[in-house]
Regions:
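Amphipathic alpha-helical regulatory regions
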Residues: 57-68
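Structural motif
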Residues: 49-59, 99-105
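Conserved small/polar residues in nucleotide/adenosyl-binding loops
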Residues: 171-177
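N-terminal export signals and maturation junctions of secreted/periplasmic proteins
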Residues: 6-34
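Helix-adjacent hinge/juxtasegments
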Residues: 71-101
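Short amphipathic alpha-helical segments and their helix-coil junctions
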Residues: 33-53, 85-97
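Acidic/histidine-rich alpha-helical segments that form the ligand environment
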Residues: 99-101, 105-136
Length: 181
């Protein structure tokens, strides 16, 4: 594993960071932006695609695209813009057996792009992998509940409603053929 990938993983799995991962924290977002925005830019421009040759480097790439995007671009549609690439990388990682070479905490973040997806097929993939790869996770019950809540939102709304204010384009409302104007 290269030094940058190791630095990303060391940062993300540090005990101090664990408490901040899923909370809105502008200071934490700024730390990620300062430390890893350059890496994120390289990842989205395919400069880090060779990281996919090794399981833990692949995980670092997924964290850059899936997790750090949400911190770097909070409240901006760019926060979700790279989810598709992260999912494609995860698909390859699963196919290549990389999950077998990770611990349960690493597997969780490798699979999280499926739950971040607004496509129900990705949620189905996540559930198929959940019991096989995360049943030994100490927070397995909470993870399953968390994922179920996300999946129910997708089934009900076909998207994550909390993203509406960030991602919805209102141009369709001004088209002359729109019956609701």
């Amino acid at each position: 594993m290269n030094d940058r990938a190791k630095e990303i993983l060391d940062f993300w799995f540090d005990d101090m960071v664990v408490e901040k991962r899923f909370k809105r924290d502008n200071n934490f977002d700024q730390v990620i932006k300062n430390k890893f925005k350059g890496d994120h830019d390289k990842a989205i421009s395919n400069e880090y695609d060779d990281w996919q040759d090794e399981p833990l480097s692949t995980l670092a790439l997924v964290i850059l695209l899936d997790q750090f995007s949400r911190n770097i671009y909070r409240d901006d549609k760019k926060a979700f813009e790279f989810d598709h690439k992260a999912r494609l990388i995860v698909n390859d990682a699963v196919y290549n057996g990389y999950l077998d070479k990770m611990d349960e905490y690493q597997r969780f973040f490798m699979l999280l792009p499926y739950i971040h997806s607004e496509e129900i097929i990705d949620h189905d993939r996540a559930y198929k992998l959940l019991d096989n790869y995360l049943s030994d996770h100490p927070n397995y019950v909470e993870i399953k509940k968390f994922w179920k809540e996300h999946t129910l939102a997708i089934k009900r709304f076909h998207r994550y409603p909390h993203r509406n204010n960030i991602t919805v384009s209102y141009t369709h409302l001004t088209l002359p053929t729109t019956p609701y104007v």
